[in-house]
């Protein structure tokens, strides 16, 4: 697993929140166009790489900053005020990074991935839902097929957000072909490990820049890429709580920005009406 070292922005003398604000400024510039065209926010995500936001949770010993959930939620809130799509992409990515950090220690392959993620600021997507399972992420149809020191996986993913733009995918799967649907594992896949065949288009309302679509995911790699800890523990301890904290921070940021826009609109209308507020507008200008 080769590592490409990213240039350090100001030797990381700025805080995570200060860097997030700079990324938010880039994201805000393209936010309307991104949502209108359902296009990936390339400039904003590149800015997140440059300002080293994608690897903030990686422990210091693996080249990261040892960022906390508080850092992630502040980051997501800040980005949410600027561009909903950028913020949600970062939130989903950070949820997967949290799983890697908390459940990948002690596994040589996953520790090497942490080092690479910190160095290259890789972007990770996730594959958690399937055609047969709908939105139930605690039930998998596709199974990991082990072959000596390797594995293969064929998965009908109902939706993968920014799957074609990501550097890797974290996927859920059944532990084996004869395992129960709820006996699941988490697998870290690099771009060279898989192919994606688009099977379903999503015409989403909002957050269109997440580029969410259905795919047939065909993957193969080393058995070391499968997390040793069972997914039920990862789901309960990390995946669900971090996802909900990150997503809700994004939504809070979106809501705060919407209120600000409403306030500006009402104040402009009031100035044009000699200071008279529109009906029902007083609570927006408190």
Outline where the language-model segments fall.
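Alpha-helical interface subdomain recognition
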Residues: 2-58, 64-74, 249-286
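Glycine-rich flavin
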Residues: 42, 46-50, 55-157, 161
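Fold-independent oxyanion-binding glycine-rich loops
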Residues: 128-131, 156-157, 174, 189-192, ...
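Glycine-rich beta->alpha junctions and the first turn(s) of the following alpha-helix
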Residues: 204-286
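A short core secondary-structure module
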Residues: 159-196
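Short beta-alpha junctions and helix-cap segments that line functional grooves
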Residues: 156, 199-202
């Amino acid at each position: 697993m080769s590592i490409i070292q990213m240039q350090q922005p100001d030797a990381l003398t700025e805080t995570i929140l200060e860097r997030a604000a700079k990324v938010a400024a880039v994201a805000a510039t393209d936010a309307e166009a991104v949502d209108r065209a359902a296009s990936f926010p390339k400039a904003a995500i590149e800015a997140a790489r440059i300002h080293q936001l994608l690897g903030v949770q990686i422990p210091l010993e693996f080249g990261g900053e040892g960022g906390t959930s508080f850092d992630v939620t502040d980051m997501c809130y800040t980005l949410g005020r600027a561009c909903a799509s950028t913020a949600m992409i970062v939130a989903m990515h950070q949820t997967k990074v949290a799983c890697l950090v908390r459940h990948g220690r002690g596994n040589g392959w996953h520790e090497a991935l942490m080092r690479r993620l910190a160095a290259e600021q890789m972007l990770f997507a996730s594959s958690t839902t399937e055609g047969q399972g709908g939105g139930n992420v605690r039930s998998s149809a596709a199974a990991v097929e082990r072959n000596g020191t390797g594995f293969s996986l064929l998965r009908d993913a109902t939706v993968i957000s920014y799957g074609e733009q990501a550097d890797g995918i974290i996927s859920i799967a059944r532990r084996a072909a004869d395992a129960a649907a709820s006996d699941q594992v988490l697998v870290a896949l690099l771009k060279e490990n898989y192919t994606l065949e688009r099977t379903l288009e999503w015409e989403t309302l909002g957050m269109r820049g997440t580029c969410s679509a259905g795919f047939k995911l065909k993957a193969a790699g080393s058995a070391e890429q499968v997390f040793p800890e069972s997914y039920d523990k990862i789901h309960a301890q990390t995946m669900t709580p971090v996802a909900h904290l990150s997503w809700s921070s994004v939504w809070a940021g979106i809501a705060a920005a919407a209120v600000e826009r409403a306030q500006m609109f009402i104040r402009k209308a009031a100035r044009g009406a000699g200071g008279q507020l529109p009906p029902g507008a007083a609570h927006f200008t408190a």
